[in-house]
Amino acid sequence: MLLIQNGVILDPYTGTEQVSDILIGDDGIIAEVAAHIDAPQGAQVYDACGRTVTTGLVDVHVHFRDPGQTHKEDVFTGAAAAAAGGFTTVVCMANTIPTVDSVGTLRYVQERAAQVPVNVLQACAITCGLKGKELTDFEALHAAGAPGFTDDGVNLTDAKLCYEAMLRAKALEVPLSFHEEDPKFILSPGVNAGSMAAIQFGVPGAMPSSEECMIARDIALAQRTGARVAFQHISSALSVDLIRKGRELGADIHAEVTPHHLSLTELDVLEHGTNARMNPPLRTERDRMALIEGLKDGTIDMIATDHAPHATEEKDRPFAKAMSGITGLETAFSVCNTALVHAGHLSRMELMTAMSKNPADFYRLGDRAIAPGNRAELMIADWDEPIVYTEYKSKSTNTPFTGKPLFGRVYAVVVGETLVEN
């Protein structure tokens, strides 16, 4: 048994905050929540020391590079990074080598995921080989445990095929997640078109229209099909406006935003270079503030890291030749706490709703409230403790947040009966 004492429970499922102890049975199920619980004989006792005990973070968008590129990350190091960052559940993208578009490859990831303490779910590809030509076998993959489908990393440009995918997903009541970047508007990826960084690095960049056009199209398709759809890592003010209008029209649409798009702008690319190169790129301060407003009014309902590890030599190149993407699992809580809570934009409860409850609800992971009878998925953290990241559990260190003063330290996560301390 595990007894967590002297914690301040912050529960986004009930909207309550209270000082309580939590007793977790050997089966990983919460047995009791009370103001004071005496330790049963033989129980492991963890003193939270007045820190927050909240529901574990859920990241619906990570890349563990497993199979195929395990020099960057694998299920084991990715899970360690997730736990260090406060995440108890993550959803891996399908753009591995080979693509997760078959039951066999899905089983490979599931077998490795069964060996780590956090919940690692594996989404499957919408199209075979991410080629945008033929739909995968949704039915067989869903039956084998795929929680949803995505061609993340590439845009599904064929509108008719996208429509058919939504119909199939709706019939199975599983979600789809879309990487919305029309390549016709991307002359060079990873930097905002027309920005000072694009000029400095001598590249034309990626236009916001690449994202906005695809979102507009897929809102219409989602409205017609009734499919549950998420727009991944949105980056522009107009995208927020389009999604807001789509929600008003009744479409079952959802939106992710990354910690880096909430805290950085195109100007930061000048300082951090390739460690601030990602798809979609960082945009203007106006876009950043629109993303925050979208979070505040619920238009954007999920914060997701798009954790994208790359080897040092893949980033240590001229900007135009470097890989896009940054790591995010270990820094996400601190970055969001600093940029959103400490900056006065969101409450702690609102941040936990966006980083824990809403992502879990999108994948229908069930009731994760901190209450007797529910499986324990917890994060223990100090919101106000300063922290500077210099070392990582991830195999990769491609992040602009190294050495940056932040607030918010994760001390431990609990997944079922397992306590993982930092």
Language-model regions, residue ranges each:
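Metal-associated gating/positioning segment near the N- to mid-region
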Residues: 49-113
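A glycine-rich helix N-cap at a beta->alpha junction
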Residues: 111-126
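Divalent metal-coordination and catalytic microenvironments
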Residues: 7, 22, 27-28, 50, ...
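His/Asp/Glu-enriched, well-ordered alpha-helical/loop segment
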Residues: 200-228, 275, 296-303, 308-383
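Acidic (Asp/Glu)-rich catalytic clusters
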Residues: 109-115, 138-143
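Histidine-rich, glycine-flanked metal-binding segment
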Residues: 1-56
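Histidine/acidic residue-rich metal-binding segments in metalloenzymes
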Residues: 133-303
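C-terminal cap of metal-dependent C-N hydrolases
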Residues: 7, 318-321, 375-422
